[in-house]
Amino acid sequence: MTDLIKLDAATLAAKIAAREVSATEVTQACLDQIAATDAEYHAFLHVAGDQALAAAATVDKAIHEATAAGERLPSPLAGVPLALKDVFTTTDMPTTCGSKILEGWTSPYDATVTAKLRAAGIPILGKTNMDEFAMGSSTENSAYGPTRNPWNVDCVPGGSGGGSAAALAAFQAPLAIGSDTGGSIRQPAALTATVGVKPTYGTVSRYGLIACASSLDQGGPCARTVLDTALLHQVIAGHDPRDSTSVNAAVPDVVGAARAGARGDLKGVRIGVVKQLRSGEGYQPGVLASFTAAVEQLTALGAEVSEVDCPHFDHSLAAYYLILPSEVSSNLAKFDGMRYGLRVGDDGTTSAEEVMAMTRAAGFGAEVKRRIMIGTYALSAGYYDAYYNQAQKVRTLIARDLDEAYRSVDVLVSPATPSTAFRLGEKVDDPLAMYLFDLCTLPLNLAGHCGMSVPSGLSADDNLPVGLQIMAPALADDRLYRVGAAYEAARGPLPTAL
């Protein structure tokens, strides 16, 4: 393993821009690390070495020409390679969503996020492993096998975006993209000592992000430092007329906020500790101790810390696991074997309805089928008002809790997860235990607000990573970066997985 791959993205970008190292060299170093380690971690579903090297060569040429002409580079991250979660469409490599039903399928169009990455001169190393259609908290629901946590290969890396987080922790990539439906960026970040951000809903385009639950899904940036995450956030955010839920608002200056925060002054910043997310069944002592230490550190930086009550958070899990399956049952109806993807039983003797049934039975995994059935039940005529409508009312109350909290504080904090990474297979047969792992993260998806997980050290219980979750109101993503960068700087360097 070369020292090059251990550098943060901002440093790599500066070296590439100064032509101290080429984008091709950096990309090749990452590809070499993937080749050397991914048999153990299985972070990637598809490695696009040729395409990544071609993109890197194009960037090197552009930098040479821009330098000669005194022009600007394509972006502040030009030439820095990236791992892309396999839920974003790409025209030059498969998009499977971790499902057999899309095995081998290549999209005819790029997602907006993919297109922005290409325009910014960021080589895409490949597509990372994930829970099937982003349904899961461990990446064990992937049809192509689980991803292993580089900190302990007997443990999960979190989910649904465990592949992207593991790729960062294993130094296979300095940058990654994930999607967050109930914590799928923040939770894996916490378990792998990386940084992950769920932006405000609607501020990063969902065009080409294959939907799990449309009102909850949000693409976002992942990296090993807060500044790197901010730089990537700036690249992918912005209004997109092709996404009907896209917010036409200015992107907050997240990079400026991260740089300001790194100076370590939080005087006047009001931080609320969410009462409902700091204790209870399932919280490990080591996680709570790490959280308490993080809050003390924030106080030492000058922040004004108080406890905040969000009473309806106690009902967020129940509401989420009615709303999400309901949207899943609708969104996944399109995967029927008729137009693209897997087709089973089409031998000339079966009807279209039979082919659809056989295709879906063979193509979807157990967790996807479970959520489709729950959602269909919740949306049925006899139960729509009793279940789905009630869940939406609770969702409104959760959003009101947050709005009320932000009248007295600027950001909220909590543990990112109740425990550190659990062992592979430990919760696979217990869906409720798996769902409870999202307890700290999913309220923000219900409200559409933004959140970050930043590493807060290693748990004294098992020496595995712990994450601090920072939350902010909609369109105040810059607050996450100011507080996160200040905490990161005060916390100091942490051990790495490798």
Swiss-Prot record:
One of its GO terms (cellular component) is glutamyl-tRNA(Gln) amidotransferase complex. The active site is at residues 85, 160, 184. It catalyses: L-glutamyl-tRNA(Gln) + L-glutamine + ATP + H2O = L-glutaminyl-tRNA(Gln) + L-glutamate + ADP + phosphate + H(+). Gene3D superfamilies: Amidase signature (AS) domain. The keyword Manganese does not apply. GO terms for biological process: translation. Its EC number is 6.3.5.7. One of its GO terms (molecular function) is glutaminyl-tRNA synthase (glutamine-hydrolyzing) activity. Keywords: ATP-binding, Ligase, Nucleotide-binding, Protein biosynthesis. The keyword Translocase does not apply. It comes from the Bacteria. PANTHER family: GLUTAMYL-TRNA(GLN) AMIDOTRANSFERASE SUBUNIT A (PTHR11895:SF151), TRANSAMIDASE (PTHR11895). Heterotrimer of A, B and C subunits. Belongs to the amidase family. GatA subfamily. Allows the formation of correctly charged Gln-tRNA(Gln) through the transamidation of misacylated Glu-tRNA(Gln) in organisms which lack glutaminyl-tRNA synthetase. The reaction takes place in the presence of glutamine and ATP through an activated gamma-phospho-Glu-tRNA(Gln). This is Glutamyl-tRNA(Gln) amidotransferase subunit A. It comes from Mycolicibacterium vanbaalenii (strain DSM 7251 / JCM 13017 / BCRC 16820 / KCTC 9966 / NRRL B-24157 / PYR-1). The gene is gatA.
